[in-house]
Amino acid sequence: MSLDCYDVLIVGAGPAGSFAAELLARGGARVALFDGRPEGEPKACGGGVTAKALKAWPQLLNAVGRTITELDLYSPSSKRLHLVLDEPFAIYSRVAFDCYLRDRARDAGAHVFAEKISARKITRSDSGWRLKSDSGSEWTGAFLVAADGANSGIAKKLAGPLQPSDMEVAFGYRAPLPANNNAATVVAFLPAWVGYAWAFPRPDHISFGIATTQDAFEHGPLDQLLWQFMTGYYLQCEGQKVNFWHGKTDTPERADIEDHLRTSAERYAARIPGLSAKTWDSRTVSGDDWALLGDAAGFADPVTGEGIYYALRSAELFAEAYLSGAPQTYEKKWREDFGAELRRAAQMRRRFYGNFWGAPFTERMIEFARGHRGVKRVLGDLVAGEQGYVDLKKKLVKNALRPV
């Protein structure tokens, strides 16, 4: 049997896989891109794309989404900080966003296959890689790229498994927009838990969710907390004053909202990489004829869980390395480009969700920002993706010492 032979086989057609396929195909490589997700099935993700990513790849603005110019941050005690963003970000439905990037890859010349590829059906020989799909089709190629998410079996096979402490959990609901379409974008830090809740309005629905560490995850109480947040959000959209975490939860208004959401909201859940500093030091995400991209490589912010920027940037760095004839330089490229930033975020995670001057750091951070324009500006830059963690403490102190 004659098999099509490709230069690069890419498993996973999310942002990392599709963008890599586009860049490689435009550079002249013969690329096969495998999308194993059922058509129309969304990835469990808030869908936020930072201003930093939009500036780096302005073509993303052509995808159907919602541009966000204002954001409400809430402390664990529900103190509110309203940010008018100098650098807007965007929120996308992952179905629309992933489809847009996959179509760009196809238009660039990549061969896209709606086939699921599992790690146990991948074999390696002196001549390269052989992939077999669940349907029985086969392909061969010289180079293998895994971009199939945080649960990637291929990544486990090539780079070894991650520890539970290196993973985070996100879960939530896709729910209808408020009747008046008055949908604010909200991030609310959790009381007595590591992590935060979000409400991200998209063109036709709202993505609600909670992100926390896998070590801290307890579904029952966190799901109850999320429902409290969701019902409070809709009450707030109706003009009521709401304390998300400490208000009355047994009111008739909340019960009516919850009854409606129980029949209309769609649940989702996912694991997100949140690697420790120790793991960043030791993890290798590429070899002579293979590479990991995006979540499959562990490339996500350990504090916020944000991964789309790192998915796209890792794809770009890998494509640069491969097309230059030196794919082995990918490892050095990502470490020099964003490796130190993610390692610093890993070091900061415990402190970010720990205590500072007798209260949660997130509480103090929002308190300071409410009273100081300089600190507020730094937080706005952090949301935009323009402020990194390496010099965050220095920037906060420097701005806090300036006159208000």
Q: Residue spans of the language-model regions?
A:
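Beta1/beta-strand and adjacent pyrophosphate-binding region of the FAD-binding site
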Residues: S2-G14
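N-terminal Rossmann-fold NAD(P) dinucleotide-binding loop
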Residues: G17-S18
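Glycine-rich FAD pyrophosphate-binding loop
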Residues: A25-A44
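Predominantly flavin-linked oxidoreductase catalytic cores and closely associated redox partners
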Residues: A13, G27, R104-N243, G298
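C-terminal helical "tail/cap" subdomain of flavin- and related membrane-associated enzymes
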Residues: E320-V404
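Conserved hydrophobic helix-helix packing surfaces used for dimerization/oligomerization
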Residues: V8-I10, V31, W290
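FAD/FMN-dependent oxidoreductases across multiple families
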Residues: A119, A216-A321, Q328-T329
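A conserved beta-strand/loop capping segment in the N-terminal third of enzymes
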Residues: A51-R102
